[in-house]
Amino acid sequence: MNPIAFHVGNLAIRWYGVVISIGAALGLLLAMYNCKIREVSYDEFINMFLIAFPSAIIGARLYYVIFEFEDYRDNLINIFNIRQGGLAIHGGIIFGVLAVYIYLKYRKESFFEYVDVAAPSIILGQAIGRWGNFFNSEAHGGPVTKEFISKFPQFIQNGMFIEGTYYHPTFLYESIWNFIVCIFLVYLLKKTKKKGIVFMAYIGLYSLGRFFIEGLRTDSLYLGSIRVAQLISVLGIILSIFFIYNIIKKEKRY
């Protein structure tokens, strides 16, 4: 799989960056539609995005480097080279959400009002962004048989044939799951006006899919013998259930 999309002079533009950019652009288009549904300012959303997106990239890289520091100890300058991958989505979510919270607090805007609108766009960006892993031949699962991989389209088979071995296309599993969650979140955004429900549904549903898919991957970040992504996913599921339960419970009181 060729990770280079095209060249600008001597500069190689990698598919990884192209795919992330496409995901961000389509996420913004979806947000334009969802802002109308919830009657929130799209201009304010754009301002929020301009703070959240770079914060998320920094957080995703920092999170990855912390757990893989041995790979960078002898060449620290490579920490700043993200063109070949090395972004951990959980770090991106944490830093992005924190940046948004600080910004909206400063602007005296409702945090949940805006992150509810953002949730479908975030998961859409993640669904598309996983294809960047495909072009980088990363974030795949363990070895599989030719018979198993033959059930997938030919270009997936070709991309998952790495150094003489076929691998689980876990990037594809997560991409499909994220697209399904995105559709559900857009539906939920139309059906409920309760602040926080859509965003917490995103946290819970993404975490649910990631927990199971992570178990198939061969490049997980570890804390001792524990896969970090699975640990964070469990916490995300618990937080989501707790928050949504309390919203529903509060509604029944009144």
Swiss-Prot record:
Keywords from the named record: Cell membrane, Membrane, Transferase, Transmembrane, Transmembrane helix
Gene Ontology terms, MF aspect: phosphatidylglycerol-prolipoprotein diacylglyceryl transferase activity
Pathway: Protein modification; lipoprotein biosynthesis (diacylglyceryl transfer)
PROSITE patterns: LGT
Annotated binding of a 1,2-diacyl-sn-glycero-3-phospho-(1'-sn-glycerol), by residue: 130
Cell location: Cell membrane
Gene Ontology terms: cellular component: plasma membrane
GO BP terms in the entry: lipoprotein biosynthetic process
EC class (word): transferase
Topology in the lipid bilayer: Multi-pass membrane protein
Positions of transmembrane segments: 11-31, 49-69, 84-104, 109-129, 169-189, 196-216, 228-248
Primary location recorded for the protein, binned into one broad class: membrane
Similarity annotation: Belongs to the Lgt family.
HAMAP family per record: Lgt
Protein name: Phosphatidylglycerol--prolipoprotein diacylglyceryl transferase
Organism: Clostridium botulinum (strain Okra / Type B1)
